[in-house]
Amino acid sequence: MLQSDDFSFLPCTKEDVLAIASRGHFCFPPFDPTRDDDPVSLDTFFCNVVPNEDEDHFSKTYKLVKNIKPNDILALASIANSGFSFGLYENKPVNLRNTGYNEAFPSVLLLAFGVRLDWQNRGIGSLAFKKLIQMIRESSIAGVRLLILHPLETAVSFYKSLGCVEVFNEEFQDEVESMFIDIWHK
C-alpha cells in the first residue's frame, strides 16, 4: 500500500506536464494543457499570473514522484502566493512567515492539482493532496485557497472529504464558472 512518505515533491517542467498529458486527462478540473484555448492551458498551469514581480512571487509547480523517471510521475500541483486578503487570523502561530502580500496571515493559492489518469481511483490523489498540505504547513503557511474551474461534483466532494470548505462561487475569467474552497492550518 502506497504511503505519503513514498513520495516527494520536485520542481516540475513543461516537459513533465506534457509527458503526463500525453497519457490522458489527469486533473481536477479536467483540462488539456496542450491547447492554448483551454481555460487551464500550460501557461495558466504554470501560473505566471503575477507579472513584473520578483521571481519569488511566481508560482511553484511540483511533480509528485516515487522515483525520478518520467513514467513514475503520478501527480502535479501548481501553487502561487495568494493575492487574496483573508482578513484577520487571530490565532496566528508566531512562526508564520509573510508571503509578500501583506495579508493578515500567509496563504497560498492552489491553481491546479491532478493525478495521471492511469493512477486515478487508487487513493493517490488523497495521498498527494495530504503530502502537499503537509509541505505547505512545514513552510509556515496557514491558509490554502483552492480554485476549481468548471466545478464537478466529484472534484468538490473529493476536496471536501480532505477537509476543505467551500468559500464562494463566481465567474472567473471570461465567465468561466469557478469555485473557491479553503483549507486552514490546524
Regions of interest found by a model, annotated:
Residues 2-56, 61-66:
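Short amphipathic alpha-helix that is part of the acyltransferase structural core
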Residues 59-65, 76, 107, 112, ...:
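Short hydrophobic/aromatic beta-strand element in the GNAT-like acyltransferase core
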Residues 70-112, 120:
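Conserved acyl-donor/pantetheine-binding loop and adjacent beta-alpha core of acyl/acetyltransferases
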Residues 111, 116, 152:
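Residue-level recognition of the GNAT/N-acetyltransferase active site
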Residues 119-131:
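Conserved acetyl-CoA pyrophosphate-binding loop and the N-cap/start of the following alpha-helix
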Residues 129, 134-151:
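Conserved GNAT acetyl-CoA-binding A-motif
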Residues 143-154, 169-186:
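C-terminal "cap" of GNAT-fold acetyltransferases
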Residues 159-160:
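Conserved active-site tyrosine of GNAT-family acetyltransferases
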